[in-house]
């Protein structure tokens, strides 16, 4: 394939997953940590793989913000809802969504060549909150104004302060107005048991993308996993066996997703270097 040929992701649902797994393995190792939990149906002793989240404004270069805006701005040349379609395009790349978003081959090609997933690992943060705030702060009945990262960090540290580390990993955390999921990010350094809701389907999708990149145990939880079942000795844990799909409904509900992902599948997908 020549470099100037159109790259299409229309028939490549899930094409981002092998890149995501490789990047996570290079930086944080959280997907491998989750696969170990699934294989053993047991939470390993020791700390959860940590991610040093920061506020977006703490990154001088703001590479992720520039990259996202470049993609969205290109879409607005042809689309009135570029942000929503771009989010759907990423979701398609993560193996989610029922159908490919309605974008032209040219936009699909531009986004494929331009979107840089690796930057999210270089600048770990809730980048979607800033994008959503700029898009939804005015003229929108569901206006969005995110809680500052410094406040979220403080709230998380206060919530989990003084607790026994091994028990905290099973303690349930629920955000009833999760937005793009910033509370999930900071809480993920302490617990594996996370869920939330939001009234906006767009924000829910952004939270899902954050989950795939940073919080795999929120993005994927297979049937039969018993690590969060209630026991007489652990009243902090809750039974999540019936919550296996991270999908948004009309009321903005969020539940844990169950894409068709396995370690074997992702290993096979990782052998494919690029879309052809």
Summary of predicted features, one role per range:
Residues 145-242:
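Conserved S-adenosyl-L-methionine
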Residues 217-276:
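Long, ordered, amphipathic alpha-helical scaffolds
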């Amino acid at each position: 394939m020549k470099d100037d040929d159109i790259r299409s992701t229309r028939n490549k649902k899930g094409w981002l997953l092998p890149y995501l797994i490789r990047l996570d393995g290079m930086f944080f190792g959280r997907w491998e940590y989750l696969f170990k939990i699934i294989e053993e149906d047991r939470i390993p002793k020791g700390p959860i793989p940590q991610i040093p989240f920061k506020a977006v404004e703490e990154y001088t270069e703001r590479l992720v913000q520039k990259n996202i805006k470049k993609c969205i701005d290109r879409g607005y040349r042809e689309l009135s809802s570029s942000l929503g379609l771009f989010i759907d395009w990423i979701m398609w790349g993560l193996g989610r969504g029922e159908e490919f978003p309605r974008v032209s081959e040219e936009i699909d090609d531009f986004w494929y060549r331009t979107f840089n997933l690796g930057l999210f690992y270089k600048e770990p943060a809730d980048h979607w909150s800033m994008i959503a705030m700029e898009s939804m702060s005015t003229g929108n009945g569901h206006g969005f104004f995110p809680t500052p990262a410094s406040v979220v960090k403080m709230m998380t540290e206060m919530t989990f302060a003084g607790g026994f580390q091994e028990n905290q990993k099973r303690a349930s955390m629920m955000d009833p107005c999760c937005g793009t999921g910033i509370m999930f990010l900071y809480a993920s350094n302490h617990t594996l048991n996370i869920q939330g809701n939001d009234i906006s389907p767009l924000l829910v999708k952004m939270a899902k993308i954050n989950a795939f990149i940073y919080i795999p145990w929120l993005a994927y939880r297979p049937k039969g996993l018993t690590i969060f079942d209630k026991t007489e000795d652990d009243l902090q844990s809750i039974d999540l066996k019936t919550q296996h799909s991270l999908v948004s409904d009309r009321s903005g509900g969020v539940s844990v997703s169950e894409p068709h992902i396995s370690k074997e599948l992702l290993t096979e997908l990782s052998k494919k270097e690029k879309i052809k």
